Swiss-Prot record:
PROSITE patterns: ATPASE_ALPHA_BETA. It comes from Shewanella sp. (strain W3-18-1). The keyword Translocase applies. GO terms for cellular component: plasma membrane; proton-transporting ATP synthase complex. Keywords: ATP synthesis, ATP-binding, Cell inner membrane, Cell membrane, CF(1), Hydrogen ion transport, Ion transport, Membrane, Nucleotide-binding, Translocase, Transport. This is ATP synthase subunit alpha.
Length: 513
């Protein structure tokens, strides 16, 4: 079959008429300077604050300094091959990360890319890393507990769903251990967890992931990693990425817990970026907006009301409140809580758990200082039975500390003072707890009941731990129904008190430890 010239020209004309040009207008600029992960770009007239700038090699930078004739941007990744004269483009997009249930059980980097070798992630969409926190009207008061599994915390410094509770202390005082145990304790509670590791060694993070897996908590947890060897920009943005992943559950009427380990390293990364961008330094060389750096992050942790959830899900979820509980960690230097970053975060959060080196070294673990540790809103969320029983624990410990210091100077003590000291030292011993061994509400209740009702008086100090272990074993076997009831309801009444007393009386009379 032969086509004549007329048919060929008609065919070409038809194809030309059908051809659609898809044009995209994008602003292009030129790199004029590169130094330490910071690039200065000329020619990007319409760039937004925080916008992603496309670099060669499928990399991005984030615009942080918008100046009269140039833009200062921080590179998200390696920058060694970038040089003066390289062309870059605006994207019109703010940085987003993948969110959804597919991230549970996975280890990802700041950008939400998997780094655990388990293949691609099945996400439910994307969310911006910078989100405005829910307003006052959209929030609900904190009234449900987050059980950490630690007697010392759940009894004296209770944490509620939607609260921000700071864990603060020097290095090697058990801050990460406490946060990891809190995550492990949520594996059957329905609370989804996010662990954000900032500026840590890769080996340390690998160990944390392994421990979570061993205790069956990884399937319920998202691990976001920005190691010490990664760019300062990734360390600075990691907490915001993790927060967006946690907000996915909060906004759908579920409960989530996020651990930032730790925000001191994030502040250092932000200080590095700010100094390289030539922003004026302030106290301790931190930039002027370092308070806002943490406040805008921690304000996103909240308990939102039913109206907010219904509005967000467009009616798909009704009658449910959502919460995001934050446990930020701050590392102090030589116990100095009055330094710049610690005081900032203390003023933002709803309380703090202060861990002391001296207590840790003396064998008291968790090394919680009950004197300056406080929970400002958790009391309303505390489980009924723990709240009722633990009232005297904090007082006993505070009085014991005071009397112990005083008794060093006094040669003879009256019987009442000696009894208080004996009680205080036994309660202190009872508060000790091993790592990776979180306790149920019922187990905590039995231990605290024994201390409050004077059952420890006749127990040798060095045998308090053995007494507790034997008591819990006895109660779990002989009073399993009571333990189950306490775990399920958390109630405390005369009937439960009578059964606890009967169980303890029988244990003391018949058992050895």
């Amino acid at each position: 079959m032969q086509l004549n010239s007329t048919e060929i020209s008609d065919l070409i004309k038809q194809r030309i008429e059908q051809f659609e040009v898809v044009s995209e207008s994008r602003n292009e600029g030129t790199i004029v300077a590169v130094s330490d992960g910071i690039i200065r770009i000329h020619g990007l007239a319409d760039v937004m604050q925080g916008e992603m700038i496309e670099l060669p090699g499928n990399r991005f930078a984030i615009a942080l300094n918008l100046e009269r004739d140039s833009v200062g941007a921080v590179v998200m990744g390696p920058y060694a091959d970038l040089a003066e004269g390289v062309k870059v483009k605006t994207t019109g997009r703010i940085l987003e990360v993948p969110v959804g249930r597919g991230l549970l059980g996975r280890v990802v980097n700041t950008l939400g890319e998997p780094i655990d070798g388990k293949g691609p992630i099945d996400n439910d969409g994307f969310s911006p890393v910078e989100v405005i926190a829910p307003g006052v009207i959209e929030r609900q008061s904190v009234s449900q507990p987050v059980q950490t599994g630690y007697k010392a915390v759940d009894a004296m410094i209770p944490i509620g769903r939607g609260q921000r509770e700071l864990i603060i202390g020097d290095r090697q005082t058990g801050k990460t251990a406490m946060a990891i145990d809190a995550i492990i304790n949520q594996k059957d509670s329905g609370i989804k967890c996010v662990y954000v590791a900032i500026g840590q060694k890769a080996s340390t993070i690998a160990n944390v992931v392994r421990k979570l897996e061993e205790h069956g908590a990884l399937a319920n947890t998202i691990v976001v990693v920005a190691t010490a060897s990664e760019a300062a920009a990734l360390q600075f943005l990691a907490p915001y990425s993790g927060c967006s992943m946690g907000e996915y559950f909060r906004d759908r009427g579920e409960d989530a817990l996020i651990v930032y380990d730790d925000l001191s390293k994030q502040a250092v990364a932000y200080r590095q970026i700010s100094l390289l961008l030539k922003r004026p330094p302030g106290r301790e060389a931190y930039p002027g907006d370092v308070f806002y750096l943490h406040s805008r992050l921690l304000e996103r942790a909240s308990r939102v009301n039913e109206i907010y959830v219904e509005k967000f899900t467009k009616g798909a979820v009704t009658g449910k409140t959502g919460s995001l509980t934050a446990l930020p960690i701050i590392e102090t230097q030589a116990g100095d809580v009055s330094a710049f970053v610690p005081t900032n975060v203390i003023s933002i959060t709803d309380g703090q758990i202060f861990l002391e080196t001296d207590l840790f070294n003396s064998g008291l673990r968790p090394a919680v200082n009950p004197g300056i540790s406080v929970s400002r809103v958790g009391g309303a969320a505390q489980t009924k039975i723990i709240k009722k029983l633990s009232g005297g624990i904090r007082t006993a410990l505070a009085q014991y500390r005071e009397l112990a210091a005083f008794s060093q100077f006094a040669s003879d003590l009256d019987d009442a003072t000696r009894a208080q000291l004996e009680h205080g030292v036994r309660v202190t011993e009872l508060m000790k707890q091993k790592q990776y061994a979180p306790m149920s509400v019922a187990a905590q209740s039995v231990s605290i009941f024994a201390a409050e009702k004077g059952y420890l008086k006749s127990v040798e100090l060095k045998k308090v731990g053995d007494f507790e272990a034997a008591l819990l074993s006895f109660m779990n076997s002989e009073h399993a129904a009571l333990m189950k009831l306490i775990n399920e309801t958390g109630d405390y009444n005369a009937e439960i008190e009578a059964e606890l007393k009967a169980g303890l009386d029988k244990f003391v009379a018949t058992q050895t430890w």
